[in-house]
């Protein structure tokens, strides 16, 4: 498994976040029983950079907390990356995650929990998007929320 983390901001201290993000990604893959020969890219940015990305890709000219850019194709069931053999040594990139640490810090204060908990949750949420989950309908939202809560519980990260 390759997890590439790039801190592209200097407004929020990112010390110790790499290890946390790696644990969350590995836990999501375990929960989803996804083979581990995948690659995920994570970028930490500030509100201005994520605002630009949000405007370009989603037409929304305001900062958001996290953006997910899936690269892999999925079958009808969640988390099953096509065209990868379990015994294959080929690493399959499944997507990119962009987290605004500035927004995550704001939200952690707003919601009354730790900054680390917010970053962990955003990472889990985004990973589930990379694995084919969405929250366009109430049923999809419920399924995705249950998965997020399972990941957070396995990591023993509460509110």
From Swiss-Prot:
The cofactor(s) it depends on are: Zn(2+)
Q: Name one GO cellular component term.
A: cytoplasm
What keywords sit in the KW lines?
Answer: Cytoplasm, Endonuclease, Hydrolase, Metal-binding, Nuclease, Ribosome biogenesis, rRNA processing, Zinc
**Would I find Ribonucleoprotein among this entry's keywords?**
no
Question: Which EC numbers characterise this protein's activity in its record?
Answer: 3.1.-.-
Query: Which GO molecular function entries does the Swiss-Prot or TrEMBL record give?
Result: metalloendopeptidase activity; RNA endonuclease activity; zinc ion binding
Query: Which BP terms from GO are recorded?
Result: rRNA processing
Name residues in a coiled coil.
none
* Enzyme's top EC category: hydrolase
Residues binding Zn(2+) are 125, 129, 135
Name recorded for this polypeptide: Endoribonuclease YbeY
Q: Which source organism does the UniProt entry give?
A: Thermoanaerobacter pseudethanolicus (strain ATCC 33223 / 39E)
């Amino acid at each position: 498994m390759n997890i590439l983390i790039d801190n592209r901001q200097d407004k929020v201290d990112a010390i110790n976040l790499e290890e946390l993000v790696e644990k969350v990604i590995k836990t999501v893959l375990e929960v989803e029983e996804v083979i581990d020969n995948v690659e995920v890219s994570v970028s930490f940015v500030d509100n201005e950079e994520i605002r630009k990305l949000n405007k370009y890709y989603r037409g929304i000219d305001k900062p958001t907390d996290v953006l997910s850019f899936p690269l892999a194709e999925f079958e009808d069931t969640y988390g099953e990356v096509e065209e990868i053999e379990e015994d294959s040594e080929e690493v399959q990139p499944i997507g990119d995650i962009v987290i605004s640490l500035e927004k995550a810090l704001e939200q952690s204060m707003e919601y009354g929990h730790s900054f680390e908990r917010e970053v962990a949750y955003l990472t889990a949420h985004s990973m589930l998007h990379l694995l084919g989950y969405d929250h366009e309908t109430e049923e999809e939202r419920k399924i995705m929320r249950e998965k997020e809560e399972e990941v957070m519980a396995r990591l023993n990260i509460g509110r």
